[in-house]
Amino acid sequence: MADMKQEEDELAVDPGVGAVCDPVTKLRFEAIVCLLDRIPITLQQIDMFGQDVAFRTKRIGNIEALLDFLKGSAAATWGARAGAGEPIDASSPELHRLVEDAETAYRDVRGLQPRMVVQMPRVFHKVCLPKLHQLLVIARRLLAQNVALRRLLLQPVGCDVSPMALAEAAVSSDDFERHGRNKVVIDEFGYEDLLRRRHTGHESQNDADDAEQHGREVREGEYEDLILMRHRDTSHELLQDDARRRRADAEAEQQGGDGEVRDEYEDYLCRQLGAVYSGPDQIYEHDMRGPEPAHSPNTPDQIYVPCERMLPYPSNCDNAEDRIHMACLALKNLVKDMEGIYSPRGTLWQYLEDVISLAHALFLENTKLHRFTDQASHQDLPLQPPQGFPFQQQPQHDGYQQPGVPFQQPQQGGYYGHGQGIMFQRGGYLQDVPFQHWQWQQGGYGQGFMFPQAQHQGGYGQGFLSEQPLPGDPSFMNMQAPYDGDGGVLFQKPQHYHHGHVPSEKGAIQAKGKQKMREPKTVMCPDWCRTGHCSSGDGCEYAHSQDELRVIDARPKYRTEPCRYWLAGKGCWYGDKCRYKQHRLAREPLYVDPFLTGHELRNKT
């Protein structure tokens, strides 16, 4: 009974948004973000997708939609070259539907209440746990695909095996399968065979017997991830020696000797991060002195809290290739840590969040990587996207771009942005993305490359750029200026006149008599407040800064009587535009906040 109570208390922990499982995993998250942020193709933020969806719901289920989304996307992307169909395009309605299903599934998963595991253990073990098992396998496959794609981008020209064939065979062969609880098996004819064939001159794909023989010799020992072994000579003799050495180390370790099975780059990461990876089959202890052991879902007694003097990311990775390899290794270790969801003492819901976010982010990044790998050149990362590529590079600036610097409007139907990050959000504004990473799309701001089907509606707040006429447009002089606070609407869409039919002078005089024209620069420009950019430029009648804002004298009775709607507690529809007194609005200048609505005003007051 006490054990069940303790388990219930552990599972009842609310991880919140973007939570991590332990200090080591948190450290690796920081390393991933730091390393990938310095690479031209990056995730920008691992958990951005999780921050942009609803936090809690009351339902359990619909994880199948996310699994189908990941399975179908990965299969369609790589199956096209095998005749299985066309890859899913970023602008296809099918991908949009899958993304919506994934968002729904993510909200449902985030809505899983921790105490339901204790209340309904049968439902959890029969329904949820198998689905989590599948999700973890898919995340590992996506990670293998991601590593292969990154390796492909750095592949030198002139090798015996073409980079595209190498990546295709690598992704198709790196098929992770779980057997039991702590065993991971990789399909035969793995990536190390392809690398060996490139160095030993076995270019022909028909030499299957030789490759299979060498593969068996390699796989007799423990599998070593040669994807990350950059400078390793993979000739036939060295592979045999390596297999014998690894078998001897494994036997010595089982007998309690000093033998050690460790990947050299994994060891390098451990030293740089000051962290320890404790996998399901083996334990990597770091060779520095650390504090007392802390809790880990995989091996509670074998993990160490990082030393305080250690940096959270490698500081001596100067070139892009080293950073890519280190980032891939950090991702690989993170997925290994996520296997702790099978541990009864692990905080299941924190790991579940990480697995889903990582899998979704990996799929989105792989979509971008495919755009580069489909090009003819594989020497370096392309500086400029090719024709038809949905991202366009903007000239780099030092630091953040200051408000008021105009964006260059893209061509019809195009995208605009650095390509540094991915917009997961379907609407609104991201708070953590720097200004220079904003992306413009014909479908409206905030849609991102995943949601290009929306139409630009025009008007204020409907798109990233408003449809106000430019100063050189003939219709610019025919715009109706908004009324002032004494009697009218502040914002009104411009009137466009077609076929040369311009109102006569008499009609203009009558219109001027019916409405009171407002002096310019007395209201803040809504476009400038939202985006830091105004298409009207210096000819805009609205103020673009507090220095330009003109304060006019109000009438004697302006805001001297209380607003009856505000007194009734119902809120005022006019907000700051109301002519009557509303608490703090009495006798204030006629400055209008374009974001403050009546509903927000009611909440504030």
Curated annotation (Swiss-Prot):
PROSITE patterns hit by this protein: ZF_C3H1
Q: Where is the composition biased (Low complexity)?
A: 389-403
Q: Where are the zinc fingers (C3H1-type)?
A: 519-547, 557-585
Give the residue ranges for region: Disordered. 198-218, 238-261, 375-403
Q: Provide the protein name.
A: Putative zinc finger CCCH domain-containing protein 57
Q: What is a single Pfam family found in this protein's UniProt entry?
A: zf-CCCH
Specify the species. Oryza sativa subsp. japonica (Rice)
> Which residue windows does the record flag with biased composition (Basic and acidic residues)?
201-218, 238-250
Q: Which UniProt keywords apply?
A: DNA-binding, Metal-binding, Repeat, Zinc, Zinc-finger
* InterPro entries given in the database record: ZFP36-like, Znf_CCCH, Znf_CCCH_sf
Q: Which domain of life is it from?
A: Eukaryota
Q: Which PANTHER family match?
A: CCCH ZINC FINGER/TIS11-RELATED (PTHR12547), ZINC FINGER CCCH DOMAIN-CONTAINING PROTEIN 47 (PTHR12547:SF150)
Which GO molecular function annotations are given, in alphabetical order? DNA binding; mRNA binding; zinc ion binding
